[in-house]
């Protein structure tokens, strides 16, 4: 089955009211219809709950909304890359693309290792790396 790598911004956009929520929902619906398996590096399972918790802490969403979103995330069934060498490829990608944050490059490395697209809500990352398989959530998806 085909795969697609998703970063935390795409998942969070689907879970809480966000300007990209409609696009995230449309993508997820398309992937389900086309039997595409969304996956991410293990980092995804730390980053998404952290973003949700921060949204609660800062008052962007209520505690109840945060707990609901966290529960939905836990039930989404996003596959996890089992590769143990992503940090090595990510370090090199950060060097090549002059990125200061390695965690963005871990998602890039996961997608590259599987030979699939990476979907992100981070336009800055898309523009910085300028790779054809790095897709921005804000682009036309339907």
Which residue ranges define each predicted feature?
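Active-site neighborhoods of divalent-metal-dependent phosphate/nucleic-acid chemistry enzymes
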Residues: 77-121
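Short loop->beta-strand "edge-of-pocket" segments that line small-molecule binding or catalytic clefts
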Residues: 35-39, 74, 117
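A general alpha-helix detector
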Residues: 10-11, 47-51, 69-72, 89-90
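Phosphate- and divalent-cation-binding pockets in alpha/beta enzyme and binding domains
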Residues: 23, 47, 89, 127-128
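Short, conserved alpha-helical segments within structured domains
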Residues: 41-45, 65, 86-89, 107
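Short, well-structured N-terminal submotif of metal-dependent ribonuclease cores
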Residues: 1-43, 55-68, 141-142
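Short glycine/serine- and small hydrophobic-enriched flexible loop segments
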Residues: 50-57, 113
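Acidic, PIN/NYN-like endoribonuclease modules and their adjacent C-terminal/linker elements
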Residues: 1-3, 96, 108-142
């Amino acid at each position: 089955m085909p795969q697609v790598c998703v970063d935390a911004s795409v998942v969070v956009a689907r879970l809480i009211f966000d300007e990209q929520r409609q696009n995230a929902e449309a993508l997820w619906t398309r992937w389900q219809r086309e039997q595409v398996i969304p996956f991410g590096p293990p980092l995804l399972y730390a980053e998404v709950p952290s973003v949700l918790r921060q949204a609660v802490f800062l008052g962007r969403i209520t505690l109840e909304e945060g707990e609901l979103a966290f529960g939905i995330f836990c039930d989404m069934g996003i596959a996890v890359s089992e590769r143990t060498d992503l940090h090595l490829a990510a370090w090199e990608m950060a060097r090549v693309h002059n990125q200061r944050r390695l965690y963005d490059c871990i998602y890039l490395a996961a997608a590259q290792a599987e030979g699939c697209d990476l979907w992100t809500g981070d336009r800055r990352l898309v523009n910085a790396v300028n790779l054809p398989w790095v897709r921005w959530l804000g682009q036309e998806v339907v």
